[in-house]
């Protein structure tokens, strides 16, 4: 079964996330564990490692780290992605989320909906960038990429 069965976010920041960010993290983890598609491609002529997988996401030395383990917690892979390609879309996502969180408190539903549509568009762009960066390292569907992108943003926020 090629899926993520457990996920951890290795946050090094001593500053706790805001209530909104913590809520985003919890929802993304719940949704990800409910339904996802995550597979490792074959390497060096060996057959692909089958899931389910335990995944830890971290930022170390300025790089996004995917630490992948078997369900029995044996290491099956690790790869590092440059954060450069994510910087602008993460920044844009931060800004639109701040606008959205403020809008929910004080604006009418029609204006909230417009901001939410923009937020979803930026979120989709982040998922697209992540899918591109994962090419040859891991295979994910767009919904899994969206949820992982949310967790990458949480790492930045934290």
Curated annotation (Swiss-Prot):
Pfam family, one: UPF0262
Domain of life: Bacteria
Entry's family note: Belongs to the UPF0262 family.
HAMAP family linked: UPF0262 (MF_00678)
Protein name in the entry: UPF0262 protein Rsph17025_0594
Taxonomic path: Bacteria, Pseudomonadati, Pseudomonadota, Alphaproteobacteria, Rhodobacterales
């Amino acid at each position: 079964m090629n899926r993520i069965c457990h996920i951890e976010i290795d946050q090094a920041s001593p500053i706790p996330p805001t209530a909104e960010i913590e809520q985003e993290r919890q929802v993304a983890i719940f949704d990800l564990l409910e339904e996802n598609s995550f597979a490792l491609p074959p390497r060096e002529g060996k057959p692909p490692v089958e899931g389910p997988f335990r995944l830890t996401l971290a930022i170390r030395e300025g790089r996004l780290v995917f630490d992948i383990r078997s369900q029995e917690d044996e290491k099956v892979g690790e790869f590092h992605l440059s954060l450069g390609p994510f910087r602008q879309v993460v920044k844009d996502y931060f800004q639109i989320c701040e606008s959205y969180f403020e809008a929910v408190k004080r604006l009418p539903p029609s204006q909230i909906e417009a901001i939410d549509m923009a937020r979803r568009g930026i979120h989709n762009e982040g998922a697209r960038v992540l899918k591109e960066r994962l090419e040859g390292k891991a295979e994910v569907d767009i919904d899994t990429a969206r949820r992982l992108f949310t967790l990458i943003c949480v790492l930045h926020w934290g």
